[in-house]
Design a protein with these regions (language model features):
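Binuclear metal-dependent hydrolase catalytic cores
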Residues: 1-175, 180, 185-187, 244-266
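Cap/insert and terminal regions of metallo-dependent hydrolase folds
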Residues: 180-264
Length: 266
């Protein structure tokens, strides 16, 4: 399984990166052809991310889009994907791409496009409202949502799949989406190989039940006993040194910062 960071900037696209978007790929057996191929899912598709995604995978080859929640900085570019799937080259032959997300997902897509209430997007998207306690398969990968602590319905995402160097071995990643520190997010992240954690605030910017600062993100990594932490969703005006200093108050393990184009083999 491989993670490619498409966008990592918090709350908006920034001068060095699109907003939140993460490509996760793994090799598996195609149930239709019986042959092996690469399966591709994207977690979130924030502003500016669709064009950057295109440099890593053709939108026609995308197997699934998973939305952690429906704030615009995590899903604004979904309308670009919708336009491609409807009007792009060979679109008439494309099956609807799997779309997993909160209950309000399709309504939010309509709002972004300015579409009428009867627009279903059923030709472009096969939508599933994710349910806590359920799991969802995308090729050899399994997605499990965990309740996040955020002002809207939001999920942290536990994703498991085959290791890059040994497909018989399973590896795991947890993406927090947007959340404050809470027990359900700790549960979802427990023991994962990679924790992709938002750090939307610094300690002097914090509002409750919205984002984590570095201390709380570091606490998450420690309490969940993860192997490796990648900090993301940092505001474009926030110095990474400040974030690292806060994280290190609670986490002494491996720490990296997500950057657009960064690749991580699991």
């Amino acid at each position: 399984m491989k993670l490619t960071v498409i966008g990592a900037t918090g709350s908006m696209s920034g001068p060095e990166s699109p907003a939140s978007s993460y490509l996760i790929q793994a090799r598996g057996i195609d149930p239709q052809s019986g042959g092996e191929r690469v399966f591709s899912l994207v977690c979130d598709l924030g502003p500016g991310s669709f064009g950057a995604l295109w440099t890593h995978v053709c939108p026609c080859e995308l197997d699934a889009l998973v939305l952690s929640h429906c704030h615009a900085d995590h899903m604004g570019d979904i309308i670009s994907l919708q336009v491609y799937r409807k009007w792009g080259p060979g679109s008439c032959a494309l099956r609807p791409v799997s779309l997993f997300g909160p209950e309000e997902t399709i309504r939010r897509v309509r709002q972004i496009e300015g579409a009428t209430d009867d627009e279903s997007y059923e030709a472009e998207f096969a939508f599933t409202h994710m349910q806590l306690g359920e799991s969802y398969a995308v090729g050899p990968m399994t997605i499990r949502p965990f309740r996040a602590l955020h002002p809207v319905e939001a999920f942290g995402l536990h994703i498991e799949g085959p290791a890059e160097d040994d497909p018989s071995r399973r590896v795991s990643l947890f993406y927090t989406g947007d959340t404050d520190l809470c027990d359900t997010i700790i549960e979802g992240a427990r023991g994962v190989d990679v924790l992709l954690s938002e750090v939307g605030f610094t300690s002097d910017e914090t509002e409750p039940d919205m984002h984590m600062d570095g201390l709380r993100a570091g606490t998450l990594a420690t309490r969940a006993a993860v192997e490796r932490m990648i900090a993301t969703h940092i505001q474009p005006w926030t110095p990474r040194e400040r974030v690292a200093s806060e994280i290190r108050q609670a986490w002494q393990g491996p720490l990296e910062f997500a950057t657009s184009g960064m690749e991580v083999s699991l």
